[in-house]
Every structure is written in C-alpha cells, then in structure tokens.
C-alpha cells in the first residue's frame, strides 16, 4: 500500500487510496454478490407467494414478509419460527423446495424436530396447512390440547392474510358499525393474549377493530399538547389506516388508583346497593383479584366480544392500560360501568398518519415510532364536546376528542469522513480483511433530531415578520423576552401557556427565556437550576442562574448591537419588572418594545387545549367570610391610601374575595379572571365558558357585574379616560403581579403598587378556617402514617418500588378520605442522589432500595383546609456524616418551632436564622426559603409572607392566626438530600417575666420524625425535650384515632415510631 507524502494526512484520504482499496476488495466481490442474490431471491419468492394466495382468494393479511423473523413466536426455541410464511425452510439452499402451487402439509415443517408421538405425526401428515386450519384446531382441542403449541408454531400463513391495497380511501369519516372485514394489524406483541390458536380468531380481530373504532375516540379526553409526542406503546392499527397508541404522558398508575378508589368509596358510600350491579355488554368494571395488593383491582373496560372457545368468558379492553383481558363473566368479576366513569380520560389515543395511503405505509410509520418512541403531532381531527353537553356526563370542552394526526420524526445523518483502513481488519494477526468489510461500509449513525433548534430558527424568522415590524418602526427585533408564566404571573401554569416548555423542554415553575439572533438563554432560580439543566435541550440553549433584573439587562446590553430593539409580550412581563428593567439601563443600547400577541404562538401550530370548567361557589358550610364583608374591608383600606379603585390580577386574591374556585391551573383551584373594584361597583372579567346559570345568579346576588375576560384592559382604559378629572392626586391600587399591558394603562403617576393591603385583609384566618386547617392536617397526618407503616412492612417483605410508585401510593392513601380534593403541589419523592435536587420529580425508573435514604414532600387540598409536610427516611444503616447533617437540620427545625418572638414587627427574615444557625456553625446551608404561609383551599402559599434570607418587607410581618410551614433542609450534591417540614399555626403566648405579648408556633402536622438516624449527642436537653413532647402529642392524637378505628397495625407502628429518645 502507498504511503502518504504528508505524514499528517491519513492514508485513506490520499488520492490514490481508493484505487488500492478497490483492487484489494475485487477478489472478494462474490461475497457481496451472493448476499445480494439471496436478498433478491427472497423478495421474488414473497411476491410470487402473495400473487398465489390472492388467486386462491385466501383471506388477505397484514403479516410482514421479513425473513427469519416471526412476530409472535420470535422468542420460541423452535426452528419453525425462522420459516417465512412456511415457504422458506432453509435460507441457504434455495428454499424449502415447495412451490407456491404445491400442497403444504404440517408434518413437512416439523419433521426431524424430534417428534416421538406417532399419533401426532400421523395426523399432521394428513393435514394441509393452508386449507384445514379449523380441522387442525378442532382435532387438537378434542384429542391433544397439550400439543397445540407445537402445531401453532408450524401454522402461521392461514392466520395472516396478505395486505390489501387501500389507496382509494379518501375520507376520514369512519363507518363505526360492525364490519365483518374489519381487522387489526401491526399489533404489539403483548397486545393479543393467548388468542392466536383460537378457532374464532378472525372474528376476535374483527371485534377488536370494531371496539377501537366505536369507543376510543369517543372517550379520549386527554388534553394533548403540540409538537413532539412521546409514545409508550403502539397497540395496533386497523384496516382503514387508523392506529391506537398510549402516550407516555398519560399517568396509567394514577388513573388506575383514582378509579379503584372512586369505585371502592362508592361501594362504601352506598351500603345498601347491590354488590354486583347489573352487567351490560358495553362499558364494564372488571374485578381483577391479582391486582388487589396494588389496590387497583377495579378496572374500567370495554366489552369486545364473547369467546366461543371458552365458555362464559369474554374479551375486554381496559381503558386505562390498553390491555386486552380474558375474564370469566360472573356477577363478581364483570359489572356495569356508569357513563360518568366511562367517559373520563382514556389511556388510548386514536391517531392517523399524514400522507399514509396504504397498509404498507402505516406499517412503516408504526415501526419508526416503535424504534424512536416518538412522533410529531401536526394537527387534530377535532370534534368538540359542547354540542354534546346534553348527552355526555362531565363534559370537558377543553379536551381533545377526535383523532391526532402524526408525522414521524425526521432523522438526519451526520457528515462523516472515510473510515480508517484499519477498520477492514480485525485484531486477529492473520486477518486478510474478509471478516470486517461490512464494518468498513457501515451506514452512518442517524443523528438525533433537534426540534428545539428548528423551533428557534422558525421563531427568529418572526423577528422581522410584517406583524412584528408594525410595532417596532419597521426595525426587526434583536431579541425576544419570554417569561415562563401567564398573564397573572403564576408559577405553575397549564400546558396551554407553557411556551417555554414548547421551545426548550423545561417543565418546572418560573424561569425567564431570552432568545437573540445567535443565542438562547434560559434563566432560572438557583433552587431549580439542576432540574432545568436536566430538562433543557443543551444543544440549543444555555441555562443560567437568575439573580436580578439588572443582571439580565446588563447581559443584553453586552451582546446586542447599538440601537437594538428587544420585544416582549406585554401580558407576560409584569409592570414592576418592566420598571426595574428601565431603571437598570445605563445606556440607550437597546429599547424594550411591547409586541401584543405572543410570537411563539405563531409557530405553535398544535397548541394544547385550554383546560378549565365552570367555576364553583364555595359551599355554605365552608368557613369563609361573606363576599360583601371582604369587599367592604378592601374599600376601607383604599380610602386612607387615596385610591379610587383597585385592579386585582392575582387569581388567588380574586377567588378568595368572591368565594369561588376553578380548575384552570394545575394544583391551584383558580380560574383566569380580572377583578375591578371601585367605591361603588365590582366588575369581574371572566371567560363566558366558565359560567353557567348557577354562577350567573350567584354573581347577580352579590351585585357583581360580569364581563368577558378579554374586555378587561379596554374597560379599564375607558374608565380611566372617563374619570380623569377626578384623579388629581388619586391613584388606582395594583399588585406586583399586574402585567405591563394593564399597568401602562394606569401609568406610574396614578398607580399604587402595594401588596400589603390585600395581604392584611386575607392573611389572618378566622376561627372556623383555623379549625378546618387543624382537622385537614390531622387527616393528612393519619394518611402519611398509614403510608409509612405500609411501606416499611412491604420493604421488609422484599417488595421493590420506584419513586413514581411511592409518590402515587402517598396520594392513594389520601384519596380514601371523603374531604380530600386533590394535590396542592406535585408530590416530591426522591431516593439517594435524586434527593440532592430539592425540586426533583419522581422517576418511574428509579428503584428505591432498602439501604437508600429517601425524602418526600407532599401537600393537599381538603374541603376545609390545606396541608404541607416533608420527611426524610433511612431505615438501614446511615453513614455518620448523614446522621450528623440530619441532626443539624432537625436542630434548626426544633429551634425555630420552639421559638417565641414579639407579636409586633416580627418579619420572616428575622426568624430564618433560627433554622440555619446549626448548619452555619458546621459550614453548611441550603438554597431555598425555610417556610411560607399556607392558603386555605387555595394556592400553595396565600400571601407573600415567607421565612427566608430575603430582606424583609412590610407585608411579611408574622401575626397570630396564620398558618406557616417550617421546612429546613440540606442537600449534599450527588449524594442525598434532607428535609423536615411541618405546618404550624401562630398562636399568642404570654411570657410570665413581663406580661408582654409574644407569638409561638403550634404544630398542625402530626407525623413522627425518624429518631433512629439522629445523633443524640448533637442535641441539647431542651431540643430532646421538644422532640419527645412532639412525639407524645403525635401519639396521643393520631394513636387515639387509629385505636378507635381498630387499625392496630398502624397503631403499633406509630407506638414504636414515637418512643422517646
């Protein structure tokens, strides 16, 4: 071989190298030509066979003609699984020797396979495979059922007819009546259970196809977002080119838990009802005893058909798992399912594929999805529920009901240089290059698609769009500011407003995205930094810690050319943020320009539906202050501040003032609205779809005018214009959350930004509310005790769990309580190194081992209050380092929880040091607040009062009658995390020394704190005394209830957990 003149130039890159490689490979070309001829022979054989089968009018099939691969029996050890439709027995000797016209007998394909059964062999010799399948099965059923598997392995072609040409399909409207030619194909290997050998198999496939067509799109109430859809499983496709998938985002375990608990509670609530309700062959409830230990034994299902081959058995399709079940039809196992449950969201989503014309196309699409686990949603075949409100129970006008249109993900190939010559040879010393030529000509590795990059390219093109130029004096913008929020500055937002997630994948709260022509930066608080780094696509985005408005403005000034224009959505940027940004500008290097209408929405073609149902008024028994009393208090607070009116944009404040609740946001019972209050009028701006006759009548009784949500800013503008003469030195109260669109209408001169007015009105709970908070925390504590008891027992019994399963278990024990409404925040459950990220989301793949530490935080809404708690557990042998750090966190918790402090002018920041001083002495700290206020059946925090390091403000004074959390922690990066959190009520206390009024914390959360991992030597006698008193209170209250309810297993566990140290 020649050598390169330039030693730095690889030999394979020299000009003469190609000729020598060709010469080297020329004697070996027969290897490649043989493979090519074999491939052509196989394809020709399959084509001939398809023609022959069609001419014989055998039922067409959708089985893929792939050599040495048979879908259902690929795990079989029998060689017959390598037969392609029973016609190519030996792939290297020219085939089986049977032509398409020859009669094929079963024994021909199992001979020399060790069959010692003469009776079996004799019968097989007389059975023609392609013509006597029914007779085969009947003989086996009657005589040798134990040998059915052997015959099944040798009989496949009659079961799978040939593909039919469906190119004439021109409409998406489907015939939902039973069609005897209906069938399914491309089904998942685990989808069709033990039915392949049934004599009514074709009828079963027809019934399954009919069931899918008539039920799935009608119960699909998932709100599916646009863009990439991650798919857990493709179940099957039907002959009219539709397919059925299960998205990864559907929480199957939660759905199973929820339904089982609902139905179990219904049975308990209706003690006189017939235990086994009447069964109908439509929607049913299956009782599957094998899942009783998981508490998901009750399953929603759709009846598919009765099985002829199994007496009194039916085939059912589970709506929450997509599994087919063969169940004996008895009153105990199969019951009637009410429509109110049948039409809740299903796991199964009906899809079709863009551009698919025949069954070969759809098979390719499905295979691509199974390889990648994803596809791109490009549109919906939407069918709205509103016109069905009279027919459908629990209508959800915001949900997708029809079919999702998919397009597979495109793959890109990397540019690659010629491979090195050394790849032709293996490590064997005598290798002559025969063994590695295939590796030398290997196809380039597909490159992962980068949808984030594509979206940024499309977004940047909008920087100079005609609509954008209309707001920027015909100058393209150089950057776009995109806060991860909505028009009311909420941290947790629904999918409909998750524009940042659409662009970069981040699904957490808060954050600020800035897109320039060359960079994409995402700023997020320190506590969420690790979570953001794990979610955001780092190929196109840079994640940075957010510290201040000034830092962001300085970064923009540094990278942008002079006289640049920076666009933003005036509904997403708050008025206060905009004011701070203007103050931070030290030069006129760029200008902030409000561009109405978010430009991200222009490229967001498949935006999720906007969730939310009709608002609900609080029950008369709910311990809330009447609406007119709250509004009068607000008006009295406005007068001393010379305010003519108040614009309330905080959704929580609006819900609290009007005693209503909604479900537009996840975890927070609020609905999108604005409230405008003057000295004489109250006007609510809300979407008309959120109102019904009941709510309209309620607002009329409260003398509240109602207008459309989008009319808020025009109305305020008109009101200000009409009352300008009355302003003079008067102002309008707005909150810090007020967006720039509304804030600029009022202006700096006539606006008063003071959150303390609303804070003072609502931060003190009344007697009834405090009573409800105590009761709800007591119920929640009992549920957590039950979970910990069950978890400890099952771990001793050898069970293993994932983080996700345990988080679901926590919610499941809470749902048994009738007053339980839902989660107040996403449950955090993290084990081992995952717990070092304090906002970690449960991982469905992370196993919690018995020797691992784990941490959980959970909060819930109840009809009479709300809860929040956190615990860290290690039931094995913790390290000394962990025990010391756990004890320091506990010391901080005890010091703050046992502190007494003056009743007046005590700010949360002044108390924060109690929780941190023990950690500081050891050179440790944590990067989140120590505590916050807790809302009464509202947001996770109902005021701005926090216990943290941030400088105090006038609205963070702690007073009696509040509910606060205390939850210090410590996080060892990559190792573990520690957090101990309780809810506390602030109560008055008189110290005997001087009779001055002080405050202290009274615990509401009554859950044991693990003492076996405490280093007692680090605790003072006062701290030990507090811990023992706390456990005495826990056992006295929780233990009394457990004993009264005869729950002795939990009682014994609690007794051991509350032993004094």
Curated annotation (Swiss-Prot):
The keyword Cytoplasm applies. It comes from the Eukaryota. InterPro entries: Creatin/AminoP/Spt16_N, Creatinase/aminopeptidase-like, Creatinase_N, Pept_M24, Pept_M24B, Peptidase_M24_C, X-Pro_aminopeptidase_P. GO terms for biological process: regulatory ncRNA-mediated gene silencing. It holds the Pfam family Creatinase_N. GO terms for cellular component: P-body; perinuclear region of cytoplasm. Disulfide bonds: none annotated. Coiled coil: none annotated. Transmembrane segments: none annotated. Its main location: cytoplasm. GO terms for molecular function: metalloaminopeptidase activity. Gene3D superfamilies: Creatinase/methionine aminopeptidase superfamily (3.90.230.10), Creatinase/prolidase N-terminal domain (3.40.350.10). Keywords: Cytoplasm, RNA-mediated gene silencing. SUPFAM superfamilies: Creatinase/aminopeptidase (SSF55920). Belongs to the peptidase M24B family. Together with pid-4, it is involved in gene silencing mediated by a class of 21 nucleotide PIWI-interacting RNAs (piRNAs) that possess a uracil residue at the 5'-end (also called 21U-RNAs) and guide the Piwi protein prg-1 to its DNA targets for silencing. Together with pid-4, it is required for the biogenesis of secondary and tertiary 22G-siRNAs. Specifically, promotes the production of 22G-siRNAs from the 5' end of target mRNAs. May interact with pid-2, app-1 and prmt-5. This is Protein pid-5. The gene is pid-5.
């Amino acid at each position: 071989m020649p050598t390169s003149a330039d030693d730095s130039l690889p030999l394979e890159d020299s000009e003469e190298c190609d000729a020598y490689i060709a010469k080297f490979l020329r004697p070996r070309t027969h290897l490649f030509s043989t493979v090519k001829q074999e491939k052509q022979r196989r394809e020709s054989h399959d084509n001939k066979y398809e023609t022959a089968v069609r001419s014989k009018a055998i039922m067409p099939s959708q089985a893929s003609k792939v050599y040495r691969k048979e879908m259902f029996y690929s795990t079989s050890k029998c060689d017959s699984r390598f037969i392609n439709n029973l016609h190519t027995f030996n792939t290297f000797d020219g085939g089986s020797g049977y032509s398409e016209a020859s009669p094929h007998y079963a024994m021909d394909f199992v001979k020399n396979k060790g069959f010692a059964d003469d009776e079996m062999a004799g019968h097989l010799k007389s059975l023609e495979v392609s013509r006597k399948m029914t007779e085969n099965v009947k003989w086996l059923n009657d005589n040798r059922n134990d040998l059915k598997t052997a015959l099944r392995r040798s009989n496949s072609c009659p079961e799978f007819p040939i593909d039919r040409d469906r190119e004439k399909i021109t409409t998406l409207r489907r015939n939902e009546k039973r069609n005897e030619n209906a069938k399914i194909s491309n089904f998942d290997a685990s989808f069709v259970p033990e039915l392949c050998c049934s004599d009514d198999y074709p009828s079963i496939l027809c019934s399954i196809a009919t069931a899918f067509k008539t039920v799935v799109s009608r119960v699909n109430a998932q709100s599916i977002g646009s863009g990439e859809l991650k798919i857990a499983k493709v179940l099957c496709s039907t002959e009219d080119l539709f397919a059925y998938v299960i998205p990864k985002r559907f929480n199957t375990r939660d759905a199973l838990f929820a339904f089982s608990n609902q139905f179990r509670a219904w049975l308990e609530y209706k003690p006189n009802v017939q235990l086994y309700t009447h069964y109908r062959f439509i929607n049913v409830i299956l009782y599957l005893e094998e899942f009783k230990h998981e508490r998901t034994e009750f399953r929603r299902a759709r009846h598919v058909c009765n099985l002829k081959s199994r007496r009194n058995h039916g085939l059912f399709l589970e709506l929450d798992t997509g599994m087919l079940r063969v169940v004996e039809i008895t009153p105990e196992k199969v019951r009637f399912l009410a429509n109110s449950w049948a039409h809740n969201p299903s796991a199964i989503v009906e899809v079709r594929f863009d551009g698919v014309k025949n069954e070969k196309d759809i098979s390719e699409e499905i295979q691509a999805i199974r390889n990648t686990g994803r596809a791109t949603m490009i549109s919906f075949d939407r069918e709205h529920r509103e016109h069905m409100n009279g027919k459908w129970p629990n209508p959800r006008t915001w949900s997708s009901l029809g079919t999702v249109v998919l397009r597979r993900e495109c793959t890109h190939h990397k540019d690659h240089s010629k491979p090195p010559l050394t790849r032709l040879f293996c490590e064997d010393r005598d290798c002559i290059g025969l063994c590695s030529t295939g590796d030398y000509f290997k196809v380039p590795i597909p490159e992962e698609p980068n949808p984030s990059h594509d979206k940024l390219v499309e977004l940047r093109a909008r920087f100079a769009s005609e609509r954008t130029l209309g707001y920027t004096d015909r100058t393209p913008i150089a950057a776009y500011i995109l806060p991860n929020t909505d028009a009311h500055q909420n941290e947790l937002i629904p999918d409909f407003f998750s524009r940042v997630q659409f662009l970069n994948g981040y699904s957490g709260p808060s954050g600020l995205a800035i897109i320039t022509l060359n960079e994409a930066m995402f700023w997020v608080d320190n506590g969420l930094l690790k979570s953001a780094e794990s979610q955001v696509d780092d190929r196109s985005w840079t994640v940075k810690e957010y510290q201040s408005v000034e830092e962001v403005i300085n970064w923009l000034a540094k990278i942008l050319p002079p006289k640049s224009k920076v666009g933003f959505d005036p509904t997403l940027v708050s008025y206060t943020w905009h004011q701070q940004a203007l103050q931070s500008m030290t030069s006129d290097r760029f200008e902030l320009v409000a561009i109405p209408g978010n430009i991200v929405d222009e490229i967001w073609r498949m935006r999720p539906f906007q969730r939310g149902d009709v608002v609900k008024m609080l029950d008369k028994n709910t311990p809330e202050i009447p609406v007119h009393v709250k509004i009068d208090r607000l008006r009295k607070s406005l007068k001393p501040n010379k305010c003519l009116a108040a614009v309330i944009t905080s959704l929580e404040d609006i819900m609290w003032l009007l005693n209503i609740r909604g479900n537009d946001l996840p975890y927070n019972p609020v609905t999108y609205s604005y409230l405008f209050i003057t000295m004489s009028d109250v006007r609510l701006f809300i979407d008309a779809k959120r109102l019904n006759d009941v709510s309209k009548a309620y607002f009329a009784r409260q003398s509240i005018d109602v207008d459309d949500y989008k009319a808020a800013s025009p109305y305020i503008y008109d009101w200000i214009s009409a009352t300008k003469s009355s302003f003079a030195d008067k102002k309008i109260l707005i909150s810090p959350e007020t967006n720039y669109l509304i804030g600029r209408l009022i202006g700096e001169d006539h606006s008063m930004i003071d959150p303390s007015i609303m804070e003072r009105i609502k931060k003190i709970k009344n007697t009834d509310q405090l009573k409800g908070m105590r009761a709800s925390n007591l119920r929640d504590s009992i549920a957590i005790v039950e979970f910990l008891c069950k978890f400890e027992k099952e771990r001793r019994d050898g069970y293993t769990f994932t983080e996700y399963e345990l988080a679901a278990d926590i919610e499941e024990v809470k749902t048994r309580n009738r007053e339980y409404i839902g989660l107040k925040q996403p449950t955090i459950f993290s084990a081992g190194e995952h717990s070092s990220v304090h906002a970690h989301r449960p991982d469905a793949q992370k196993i919690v081992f018995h020797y691992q530490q784990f941490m959980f935080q959970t909060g819930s809404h109840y009809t009479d209050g709300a809860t929040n708690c956190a615990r860290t557990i290690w039931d094995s042998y913790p390290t000394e380092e962990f025990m010391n750090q756990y004890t320091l966190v506990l010391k901080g918790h005890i010091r703050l929880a046992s502190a007494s402090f003056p009743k007046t002018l005590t700010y949360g920041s002044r108390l924060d040091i109690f929780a941190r001083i023990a950690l500081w002495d050891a050179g440790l700290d944590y990067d989140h607040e120590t505590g916050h206020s807790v809302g009464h059946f509202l947001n996770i925090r109902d005021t701005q009062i926090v216990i943290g390091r941030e400088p105090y403000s006038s609205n963070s004074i702690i007073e009696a009658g509040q509910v606060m959390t205390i939850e210090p922690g410590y996080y060892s990066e990559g190792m573990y995390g520690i957090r101990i959190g309780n809810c506390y009520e602030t109560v008055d206390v008189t110290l005997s020394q001087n009779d001055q009024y002080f405050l202290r914390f009274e615990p509401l959360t009554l859950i044991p704190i693990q003492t076996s991992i405490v280093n007692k030597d680090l605790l003072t006698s006062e701290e030990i005394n507090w811990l023992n008193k706390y456990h005495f209170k826990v056992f006295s209250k929780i233990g009394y209830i457990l004993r009264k309810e005869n729950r002795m297993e939990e009682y014994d566990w609690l007794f051991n957990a509350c032993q004094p140290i």
